[in-house]
Structures are given as structure tokens and as C-alpha cells.
Amino acid sequence: MISDQPHRLVEGLEGRFKDLEIEFHRAYWDSQVEATPESEGRRAELELELRRIKGDPDALAAVEGALQDDIHEPVLKRQLEVLRLSLLDNQMQEPQRELLVELSSAVESDFASFRPELEGRTVSDNEIDEILRSSNDPDLRRSAWEASKEVGALVAGRVRELARVRNEMARDLGYPDYYRMSLDLQEMPEEWLFDVMERLEQLTEEPFRDWKSDLDRRLRERFSTQQLYPWHYADPFFQQTPPDGRVSLDDALQNVSASELCSKTFGSWGIDLGSVLDASDLFPRDRKCQHAFCLNVDRDGDVRILANVVPGERWVEVMLHESGHAAYDISIDPKLPYLLRRPAHIFVTEAIAIISGRLIRDPEWLTKVAGLGSSEIGAIEADIRSAKAAHSLMFARWVLVMVHFERDLYADPEADLDARWWELVERMQLVTAPPGRSSPDWAAKIHTAVAPVYYHNYLLGEMLASQLEATCARECGGLVGMKEAGTLLAERVFAPGNLMTWSVLIEEATGSSLSPDDFVTGLLTSAS
């Protein structure tokens, strides 16, 4: 029986799913480090059981009833608010629940195990990335780019079906579609969000167009062609800064240990990543997920990073990014209740990861932490700062593609999504679609299927990262090697966990509400 007393209600519900949630996280980890029918089956079984428990309508009714009372304990009230959001996200009919878990598990398994063929042999994502970064053979580049999209055709049907099931669930709860429901459950006002997206589109359009025009000029010379297509760029989705001939750190970082650099970076901020790195799985192999993520298994110190590190700039940046997530997770006040021992919001932890990842293009970090020569970095410092701005511009325009596409996907899963994808790519990224291309390239991005309504958090994270950097510069004199900056982030951002809403946390941490001003100012200053 569900208690109607708020304290006992919270304790009882937490007790019902805490251990199962931890067990599910362990099974999820196992399914990603080695995708087998057994590991996938175990993960799906636990996810279904967890969703059933959280889908209890009586539990939701009890929590909503408790929130109607005049609760004077902020911690208790916040726990009830967090419970409500989690329970509401799982209210669905049993056939919907079973189909949702079946489809999402199958798609994740496909992404973890699928390897396309190129020139008669199986290749990994890392090998495709290397071709697009370095090859001067247009035919090989085209074949590699097309191979990177093959997984999209494999999963597209199931991704559409996932959108239909999610929409059915959302409409049963009174929402127009799953996209709007998800924003509500993320405590994210839709009108405010798209006002920000529109403003960022306008503010970045001219500088991005100017930067890309210069890049395209050099690429046309490099490939001896007047018409550029997606495979001429250095990333399957044109979301990573290309080594454009002026600055690349691949050679300089060829022989460094990414994990050691992360340990040194966060150690200078007073954060010990030793236990995280010891528990992590960092190098590529067959049947392992080819992407990267950080997983907080138990909200009690068991935090792990999955990566596929190979030498060079990209994976050092990825490891810094994921280590930012890990530093946040292990620094949350352990005395907080289990329900509140998580980041204040998805985009707040993304902001910390982005701050960390940006260090790869910080001349001070490259010399003081990575140990590169001052004269070596000094000679390319201006280019490094320009590359930092280019990365922010490129990534902002890429996120705009994903944000608008996802909203359209859930508005109408039956639409011509293949065409809509390329409309957005051409508008936001100024990349020309291949002639006659008619393939579900949108489904080749793993987030579309398994991390729905997530991508806007990256751009909000960019904004908050810049705002926090400005705060650290103002109050601590900077970030690199500054223990005071680590203390500021730990005390104001990490330790509170999810004790308050993201808007309140940002006001308290930076002294102002979330704004794109520092982000736009930073990229325009670096680009000039």
C-alpha cells in the first residue's frame, strides 16, 4: 500500500526502484562493452521491470496529491517534484512499454555491433573518421562517408516506430506529441527554448557563412573540384572541426595518454578521477559500442567512462568531455538523498563536459598541462583560437539541425524525413546534398533513436559553459590550473546535485540567468 505521508511516500518509492535502477545501470554497461544476445536480453529485461515499477499510476497519483499540500521542507518538496517527473515519463500501457523496450534495445544493439564494409573489409567508426580527416582520394572519401550512413538504413524503420509509440504514450497523457512532453519533463519551456534557438541561428549565421566560405575555398583547391559534397568534409555529420591545413594537433598529441591528461587536468582543480578511470573501458574492440559516454552507476561513487580512444586530438577532446561529466557525478554532495544525487539538468552536466573539452584548444592548457612546447604553441596560437571559434560555430549550426529535425520527427513520423533532413542540413550547415540522395541519413545519428529530445541540451550547455568560464575568469583569474576555479564549480554547481531547478542554480552560480551573450561574444572575439 502506498503511504499518503510525504516522507514515507518518498522513502517507499525510492526503496521500490533504487536497487533495480542500479542493477539496470550495470546491465546497461555490460551490454555496451560487449553486445551479445545475453547482455542485451538482461539489459532489456531489467529496463522493462524498472519501467513497470515507475509506471505505477497509483504512485504517480500519490506524489501529485502530496505536492498539492503546503510542504515547507525544500528537500522533501524537490524529491517529490523529481519523483513526479520520473513517474510521469513511464506512464503507458503494458503493450507500449514492452514495444518501447524491445525497439530501443534492438536499435542500441545494432549501433553497438554494426560495422560497415569498405573496399571488401569491415571498418570501424574510427577508421572512417581517419579517412575523412586525412585522405585526399575523393572516391575513397565518398565510399567512407556512404559507409558511415549504412546503419541508418538498418535502424530507420524501428526509429520511426519508436517515435510512433512515444507519441501514443504522450497523447494518452494529454500532450500533443512526445517532443513537447519531453521538454515538459525536462523542466524546459518550449517557447523559451525555441526563442533561444532562433536567436542563436541569427547571431551565428553570418560568421558561420564567412568561416565556411573560407573553408570551402581551401577544400575546392585541395580536391580540385568546384562542387563540394558531404564527403569532402572531415566528419560524417560536419560537426567536428576539420584539420584544414592551418592547425591540427593530431601530431602533437600522438603519443600522449588521454586518461593521464584528464587526471592531471582535474587534479589541478582538486578533483581525483582515479577511481573513475580505473573502472572505465577506454579502448576499441569488436562488439563494443563505438561511441563514448559517462555512466553514474549507483550515485555513490561508481562512475565509469566508455570510450574508444585512439591517438590524436579527437579522442583527447572526447576524454576531457566525458571526464567533465564524471567530475560532476563524483562531486555531488553524498549526504543528499538518492533522488537528488544527480546533476541539476542534462545541459548543466553538458556545460561542464564542454568546458573540459574546450581545453583542447586552449594554448595555456596545451603548454601547462599537455606539456607542448611554448614556442610550438606560440607559433600557432592565433590559429588555435580561431579553431576554437570555428568549432563553436560549426557545432552550434549542427545542433540546430538536430533540434529542428527532432521536433519535426515527433510532429509527424510519417513525413518525408529523408528530404527534411537534407533541407535542414543545407539551411543550417550550408552542406549540399548528394544528387539524388534518398536514404535515411538522419537515422545514422545514434541520438535520434536512443537519446530522444536531448540535442538542444548541447547548445544550452555551450551557453552555460561560456557563462561559467566568464564567472571563473572574473572571480578566480581563469580556469587552467586554478584550484579556486575547481572549488567554485564544485561548491556552486556540483555539490547541490538536483536540489534546485536549473534556473535557480545558474542564478546562484553565476549571478545572472542563462543567456547566449557570453557564448556569442566568445566565439566572435576568437574569430576576429
Name every feature range the model reports, one short phrase each:
Residues 197-206, 343-379:
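Post-HExxH zinc-binding segment in Zn-dependent metallohydrolases
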Residues 144-151, 183, 190, 241-251, ...:
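Glycine- and acidic
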Residues 281-290, 340-350:
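Beta-rich nucleic-acid/ligand-interaction surfaces
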Residues 1-6, 37-40, 81-82, 177-180, ...:
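C-terminal, non-catalytic "cap/extension" segments appended to globular domains
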